[in-house]
């Protein structure tokens, strides 16, 4: 860490030095998105002292998004150079003598079908520009002891421009001299227009604050969503972070309105190697950020699990009472209520924070028989997930996986996973790969945030990295999440229903099952089966899906409200959640098939209903020309299930006629 700080100080001195230099040459390249809305300009300035610096700008529909910002990787390789008998690099900053040798442009336009997702078909359409640089020049006659003793490096800067956003990264081709790379940071900057406001979040399970780009107490999590003074909305994210160090954003100490890519730790790599993607999404309307989140998956390699038939998303209830009889009641409840899994959480094999706890067997003080539970559950079509803390996973993973497969366990929830540095990032993704070998699905809890790895290893169904119902946030927080955290992938919010600590209405909780995407969706997080007293609206949880054929964002304003509609087969599900203010909201149903009538089962808050949950169930006939007029309570919401209406249903139920709901 001290080495990283010293390099940051050195970089600040270097920047101040080049600012006092005269530019003698500028080399420009540019790349546009297929629809022409994004324009990415990248250029290298050469100064009078011989140093060079790479910069970029980004505009969207002619409006400035990223003003002149530095690019580059900070590498400290003198130790490796000395060990191989290669002369040390004398540059104060590693990229100061990079020379552009050529470029290559490419266009890709295809689609792919995910195993599961928010859409059954994903468009992958982008323009690509690759700039190839060299550092130093090859000299003849230095091929000694089987390797090249030149101080010679190659680096490519790769840019992709999609209609959905722009991404870039640094690629290092295979070295000819055997050198490793010791990366201590990045020069990567994001200079935003003056007046930008950011949804600052200090840690992955933290609250949000809307703040200017100044006086931050610490770094900020990604994705980072911002409002620009020119009316645009921007989100900065990371993709394909597998064996690198996690990036966050910190304020640049010497340049106003500038965010610096900040790595958790240094990184040691062997070439060829590509850093993670730095991703920029831009939209005129904040709801379009949500609709463009496929870019994160597109920036990751395709599915590497050849036989994926065992990977089955679904809904799950946690057994809060870890006694055999109570767990079996959860199995019965899951089977009756259309769930697919039950989950046994922390403590089943002993104190989770003790290295001595053995996850190959049930703790002596627990009345649990795991094989018997699995046998009982399988007869009812229910699978079992179990929690295992990282302390046990680190010691026992290779022993646990064949045992759990033998028992019939379907998935593991990884608990309290250390993340951030290169070591633990690599360990975690390797652990997911190992789970795939034994046909075991994964849910990662606590601070991990996705960067698209579920495309490559879809047994990673979901992850926490979210302030959800374990912390019981308020409704305003909930209306920020779709525009921030959920841009990077599925989130395990752990939805509750009956628990009296929730700070929203019950219809709000119902709607979150649609608004929040999670292929493994926890419902009833703090609840027990006995809490259910026949409330009719629970049928919505029974029927709602966790993966989708289509997703459409109908309306929304960050921190105020959001409405999302999702389709599974012929059925549509709609969820609306509002913040702590009451409001009226018009919701057009134009996403429904034209020339088709639907039976809408509508779930809204109503204090007149004589149940503990106060949710009204209304059934009406609608079509694509209908517009619902919702009256949301403070911290409220509504949920709707649309099914194609039969002739009998059209006769039985009245048509919606614009009445308030």
Where are these regions (language model features)?
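C-terminal beta-strand-rich structural cap/linker in extracellular carbohydrate-active enzymes
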Residues: 620-657
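Solvent-exposed beta-strand/loop surfaces of large extracellular or lumenal domains
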Residues: 120, 141-145, 200-208, 602-625
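N-terminal accessory beta-strand-rich subdomains and adjacent acidic, glycine-rich linkers
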Residues: 23-299
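An acidic-aromatic substrate-binding cleft motif
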Residues: 270-341, 345
């Amino acid at each position: 860490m001290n080495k990283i700080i010293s390099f940051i100080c050195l970089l600040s001195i270097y920047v101040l030095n080049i600012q006092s230099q005269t530019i003698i040459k500028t080399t420009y390249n540019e790349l546009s998105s297929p629809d022409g809305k994004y324009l990415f300009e990248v250029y290298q300035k050469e100064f009078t002292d011989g140093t060079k610096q790479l910069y970029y700008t980004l505009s969207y529909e002619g409006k400035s998004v990223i003003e002149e910002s530095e690019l580059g990787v900070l590498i400290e390789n003198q130790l490796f150079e000395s060990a191989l008998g290669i002369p040390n690099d004398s540059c104060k900053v590693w990229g100061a003598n990079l020379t552009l040798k050529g470029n290559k442009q490419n266009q890709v336009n295809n689609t792919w079908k995910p195993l599961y997702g928010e859409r059954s078909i994903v468009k992958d359409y982008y323009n690509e520009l690759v700039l190839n640089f060299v550092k130093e020049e090859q000299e003849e006659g230095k091929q000694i002891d089987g390797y090249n003793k030149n101080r010679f490096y190659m680096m490519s800067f790769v840019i992709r421009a999609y209609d959905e956003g722009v991404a870039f990264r640094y690629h290092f081709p295979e070295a000819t001299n055997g050198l490793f790379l010791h990366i201590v940071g990045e020069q990567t900057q994001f200079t935003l227009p003056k007046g930008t406001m950011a949804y600052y979040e200090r840690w992955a399970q933290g609250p949000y604050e809307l703040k200017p780009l100044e006086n931050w107490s610490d770094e900020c999590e990604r994705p980072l969503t911002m409002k620009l003074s020119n009316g645009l909305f921007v989100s900065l994210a990371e993709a394909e972070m597998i064996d690198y160090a996690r990036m966050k954003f910190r304020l640049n100490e010497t340049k106003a309105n500038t965010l610096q890519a900040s790595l958790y730790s240094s990184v040691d790599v062997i070439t060829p190697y590509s850093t993670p993607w730095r991703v920029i999404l831009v939209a005129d309307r904040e709801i379009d950020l949500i609709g463009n989140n496929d870019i994160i998956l597109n920036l990751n390699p395709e599915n590497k699990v050849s036989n994926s038939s065992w990977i089955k998303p679904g809904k799950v209830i946690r057994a809060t009472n870890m006694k055999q009889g109570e767990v079996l009641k959860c199995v019965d409840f899951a089977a009756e209520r259309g769930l697919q899994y039950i989950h046994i959480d922390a403590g089943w094999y002993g104190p989770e924070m003790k290295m001595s706890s053995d996850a190959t067997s049930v703790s002596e003080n627990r009345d649990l028989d795991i094989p018997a539970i699995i046998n009982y559950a399988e007869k009812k079509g229910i699978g079992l997930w179990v929690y295992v803390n990282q302390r046990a996973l680190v010691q026992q993973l290779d022993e646990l996986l064949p045992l759990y497969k033998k028992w019939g366990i379907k998935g593991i929830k990884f608990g309290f996973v250390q993340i951030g540095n290169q070591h633990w990032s690599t360990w975690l993704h390797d652990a997911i790969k190992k789970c795939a070998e034994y046909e075991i699905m994964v849910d990662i809890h606590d601070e991990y945030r996705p960067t698209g790895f579920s495309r490559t290893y879809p047994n990673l169904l979901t992850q926490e990295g979210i302030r959800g119902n374990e912390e019981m946030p308020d409704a305003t927080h909930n209306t920020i999440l779709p525009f921030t955290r959920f841009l990077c992938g599925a989130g395990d919010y752990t939805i509750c229903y009956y628990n009296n600590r929730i700070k929203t209405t019950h219809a709000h909780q119902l709607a979150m099952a649609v608004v929040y995407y999670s292929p493994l969706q926890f419902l009833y997080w703090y609840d027990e089966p006995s809490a259910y007293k026949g409330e009719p609206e629970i049928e919505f949880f029974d029927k709602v899906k966790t993966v989708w054929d289509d997703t459409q964002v109908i309306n929304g304003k960050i921190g105020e409200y959001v409405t999302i509609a999702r389709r599974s087969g012929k059925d549509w599900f709609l969820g609306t959640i509002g913040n702590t203010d009451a409001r009226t909201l018009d919701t057009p149903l134009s996403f429904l098939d034209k020339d088709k009538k639907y039976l809408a089962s509508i779930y809204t808050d109503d204090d007149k209903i004589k149940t503990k949950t106060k949710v009204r169930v209304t059934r009406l006939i609608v079509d694509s020309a209908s517009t619902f007029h919702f009256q949301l309570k403070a911290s409220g919401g509504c949920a709707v299930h649309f099914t194609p209406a039969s002739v009998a249903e059209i006769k039985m139920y009245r048509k919606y006629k614009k009445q308030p709901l």
